[in-house]
């Protein structure tokens, strides 16, 4: 009976594509995140892009540190490629705001981020973005949702091999060039560089990426702005989709700061900073 209930839960419905895209447990079944549900969502997105005349513009794809994120990113890319839509895929995990930047920089019609934000490690998800760099909004959200709903036969989802997609010029790896352009733009947002110059060599900052995407870009920005004393929480420094040091990888939760606060006391920090595993939301404990 227990097994039957689990099978029913996995298959009793389709994982719904809403305004936030897909989000669900990773596993087999139509009500789970897996390569087939990712292909279904992407086939619907591809159909919508083609209907909007955006086929030639391409789609940028990023992913976070969660289980299966790189694999799901490639599944989405290869489905797009099989539909004649070029995919620009990051060479490793990146924070979500960089995806928004990349798709505008590259002139893409759409973007995809494989992430489940700060959900528990059993989850993954799929977020769709439009050419303005924001998550899908009317009328595109309902347009894409309708196209995804129309895709009912799992045997009709298009895909192709990575080798064929590359050979056809429909799969391009992106990375350092976008990173450099993105960070250059971020640095332009600084209002008082003179204030950083005055205190940067003395201010002590503790930072934790919470096993997510922020480690490299956040440290790079802080260093290039002139902050000399940045201490990264070692237990949470490297990407890990199991989030072994926290039960809930959300910087708004006090528990997420436990190791950061401990390191902060040890080094007498002036500031403790955390970012969500997928990168966009920094948080500072009061």
Locations of the language-model features?
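Active-site phosphate-binding/coordination module
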Residues: 98-157, 274-277, 286
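Short, glycine-/Ser/Thr-/acidic-enriched flexible segments
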Residues: 22-24, 29-31, 66, 94-95, ...
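N-terminal small/polar loop signature for handling phosphorylated ligands or for N-terminal nucleophile
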Residues: 60, 65-123, 226-281
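An N-terminal, well-structured beta->alpha segment
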Residues: 1-76, 165-201, 213
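Gly/Ser/Thr-enriched, mixed-charge loops and adjacent short helices
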Residues: 6-15, 124-256
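Long, contiguous hydrophobic alpha-helical segments, chiefly transmembrane helices and signal peptides
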Residues: 15-26, 37-38, 45, 94, ...
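A short acidic (Asp/Glu
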Residues: 70-73, 215-218, 283-285
